Amino acid sequence: MPGLKLVEALEYRCDRLERLIGAGYSANSDVSVQLDELYNQLHRLYFQGLKYSQDLLQLFNTFMAEDIENVGAPDDICIFASCFDDIYTLYSAFDELNSQYMEFCQISKSSLDQISFKDANIETKQLKKLPELVDNCNIMILRSIAILNRFIDWNIEVNGFFQFQKKRLLNLQKVIYST
């Protein structure tokens, strides 16, 4: 069932994005206005993903600083390190995506106002990059969420282990003090 819920959540998100992107569309509006709106939405999406990744890195750093002594098991440290490396890779990819986005915006904004109608076909090659940028941003956000889920599952497992050990120690303590 969790897979079905994930699919339903992704379908809901896709429908929501389609409504958001399509909400500003009007057959009478200028293409450059529509592109500006798409640029702004992509930029907001990028910064939301970037903030999400930064918060996740802070969580990882805090966890590493506070709980590394309690973890102890080499497998747990490897899992944590792999999550941290993945998040750092995504964080770097977000920076690369932003630089590509800014370059695309500069090229498109400077050229859209100055192109003649007969040259418009040449400039549309730049516009074809926009869906790829949106897809890359969505993929990175989904990967961040998947890594966060791995981290949370692992953290729950480790916490469960330590709670079990604490319960055993308390039971032993009761037995010792009762005798």
From Swiss-Prot:
Any single biological process term in GO: establishment of mitotic spindle orientation
GO cellular component: actin cytoskeleton; dynactin complex
Superkingdom in the source lineage: Eukaryota
Function: May be involved in protein-linked oligosaccharide phosphorylation since the deletion reduces the negative charge of the cell surface.
Identification of the protein by name: Protein LDB18
Originating species: Saccharomyces cerevisiae (strain ATCC 204508 / S288c) (Baker's yeast)
Encoding gene per record: LDB18
